[in-house]
Design a protein with these regions (language model features):
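Alpha-helical transmembrane segments and their immediate juxtamembrane cytosolic regions
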Residues: 1-294
Length: 294
């Protein structure tokens, strides 16, 4: 009972997703209407989505369907990005979507990387570096494209880029690694305490350990992302206000409260949460178009 008071695990996957969706929506309102405080709130969304992606790939019963959903959504967003640049009406709105990237591609590549790492064959595990390399290439291409000092980057088109370069992919991988580190911790502890490491498997104590390590990994990767941007800024212009991304660390507070339970998971909510992304963007963009045309 004392442990419950100290570490109340209150949030299921359902509630983490709700929080992620709400903060993402606030963020996109901030993008369309240039409201800075909304962008601050929006920094909490990415780590939560990445955390859920890592949990999803580890517990999914059908990996092919899981990546198919992410792949379809990534393709839809890619088409939207192309349309925003090629269709005159949307191009004239100057929404700046070409710089946004495809968030579902971040999640897809992160999930594929984790799937490779979960494989028992070492040469399959090594393939996990390919999604991360893709994210790094996307990050570099976006940096040069936003800088504009080298002209348009044609070797890596904007409609196949990740939204956060390597950062989102690394987060998904990192949250999976948190589970491995937790198991290692209990294994090392068993050597000194004499308690079998399997005793903690599937327990509340194990979940707390995973949550704490996940929050620490989030902090380290966020600081690394900040450092990389800070170094880049010394040499090229960086359009993104990367300092704001440091607020992502706050989402670790929600991760610390994760119970490990799935929670509400009806089919309509599963597919609705995917469809919500393009629909809410379309609604916010339409409202912005009306407001700015008045």
């Amino acid at each position: 009972m004392e442990n419950n008071r100290r570490f109340p695990l209150l949030l299921s996957s359902f509630w983490l997703k709700i929080i992620a969706i709400l903060t993402m929506t606030v963020d996109h309102i901030g993008v369309m209407f240039d409201i800075t405080p909304c962008r601050y709130i929006g920094r909490l969304a990415l780590p939560l989505f990445c955390f859920l992606a890592a949990e999803g790939v580890m517990h999914t019963k059908n990996f092919k369907k899981y990546i198919l959903r992410l792949g379809i959504m990534a393709s839809v967003i890619s088409i939207i990005l192309i349309g925003s640049e090629t269709i005159p009406f949307f191009h004239d709105l100057n929404l700046g979507l070409r710089y946004e990237g495809i968030i579902f591609l971040d999640l897809l590549l992160g999930v594929v990387a984790v799937y490779c790492l979960m494989n028992k064959r070492w040469y399959i595990k090594l393939l996990a570096i390919l999604p991360l390399a893709y994210g790094i290439a996307s990050f570099i291409a976006s940096a040069f494209d936003e800088c504009g000092c080298y002209g348009e980057v044609l070797w890596f088109p904007y409609f196949i880029r990740t939204q956060y370069g390597w950062f989102g992919i690394a987060l998904v991988i990192g949250f999976y690694v948190a589970h491995l580190l937790a198991k290692l911790f209990f294994k090392l502890q068993s050597n000194t305490s004499g308690i079998d490491a399997d005793t903690y498997k599937g327990t509340r104590t194990e979940q707390i350990a995973v949550n704490i390590i996940s929050a620490l990994i989030l902090a380290v990767l966020t600081l690394l992302y900040f450092l990389v941007h800070n170094i880049m800024e010394q040499y090229i212009y960086v359009r993104v206000i990367y300092h704001v991304q440091l607020l992502s660390i706050i989402s670790g507070a929600f991760i610390l409260l994760y119970s490990g339970a799935r929670g509400y998971n009806k089919k309509w909510f599963q597919y609705g949460s995917y469809l919500y992304y393009p629909l809410h963007l379309a609604i916010i963009a339409a409202i912005a178009a009306i407001v700015f045309s008045i």
